[in-house]
């Protein structure tokens, strides 16, 4: 295990006219216990959010704040499916890490 041993990944799609608004909000957002955040553009309006956390407890503590944040940006997002809604989230322990930034 690594010192930073928990991550969450969220797939989402932005409405074409809301990209700027979304990034205005997300660039001002931080969560206690999240040590790194990445957003990859995977399609024209498709994105993948990756958060690295100090621990599973850290993300659990911030869950209410993350839900409040989602409520703030939900209107900027397209529904992925009726089952998923506007996000497709997963999270878990980091079991392998290769990189130069320790």
State where each predicted segment sits.
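Short S/T/G/P-rich N-terminal loop/turn motif that feeds into the first structured element of a domain
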Residues: 1-71, 75-102
């Amino acid at each position: 295990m690594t010192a930073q041993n928990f991550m969450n990944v969220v797939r989402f799609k932005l409405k074409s006219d809301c990209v700027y608004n979304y990034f205005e909000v997300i660039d001002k957002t931080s969560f206690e216990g999240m040590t790194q955040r990445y957003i990859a553009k995977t399609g024209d309006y498709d994105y993948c959010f990756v958060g690295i956390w100090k621990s599973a407890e850290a993300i659990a503590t911030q869950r209410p704040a993350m839900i409040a944040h989602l409520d703030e940006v939900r209107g900027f997002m397209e529904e992925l499916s009726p089952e998923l809604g506007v996000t497709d989230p997963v999270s878990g322990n980091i079991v392998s890490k290769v990189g130069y930034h320790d």
